[in-house]
Amino acid sequence: MGFDVSFHPISPAEMDMWYFTPLEWVRQGQKDKVLDLAEQYGMEAFYAQKYLSVLQAGAAVEEQELFDKSHGFYLAVVQGFFLTYYYTRGSAFSFLIEEKPVYRRYTTPWCGVTPRAFPNPAKNGIVENYCAGVYLAPAQVVQLLEDLERDPKVRSDLERQWCGGQLPVLVKALQAAREQERGLLEATEVVEPNPISPNESRSYSNLFHCDKDGVYLFLDTALKQLAQAMEESK
């Protein structure tokens, strides 16, 4: 199964403000605080309820569950209720690190990101669908962009991973994070574009906050592949 990968600009402080603190409110039965926070950010009622539902799922997470598959994934979903996020098909830092572990230097493990202690084990990377990947801290975002500009080896490695014209989408996400002084969180299946029926594309977050560049690129590629397959089957 392929991966729908998304990149979410978010700072550790925002993780605390939008997820970890509201998570405690939900555990204490104070869901009105969550809805008040959503209202402060101008969130529509439909998405405010989705936001609350994600936090309720987070509050039900058990200690043995992987952080990446639970809180990490929910963090990415929550970010998309507040800010723009970015999509690429099948390309991820987690996969690049599997091939070339040296690139882990651009990432920070969850134990160095979360403001609170969690008993959940963490893999610090994509392990399957519906999962958080790595987190690039704000300073690491800046460093990667600098190295991308001046180091041909870094650019070559990233072009191979984000092939098919996808690298500009990643760069757009990195640049947005740098300009906003945020880090960048990777996740899978937060958004799932439907190449056959684009209007039936799904997102666990706010679909309209997904930057369209990567989605259009995937849809165009998928339709070309479908047309080619149909032509070859004649």
Question: Can you say where each PLM-predicted feature lies in the sequence?
Answer:
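Acidic (Asp/Glu-rich) sequence patches and key acidic residues
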Residues: 1-234
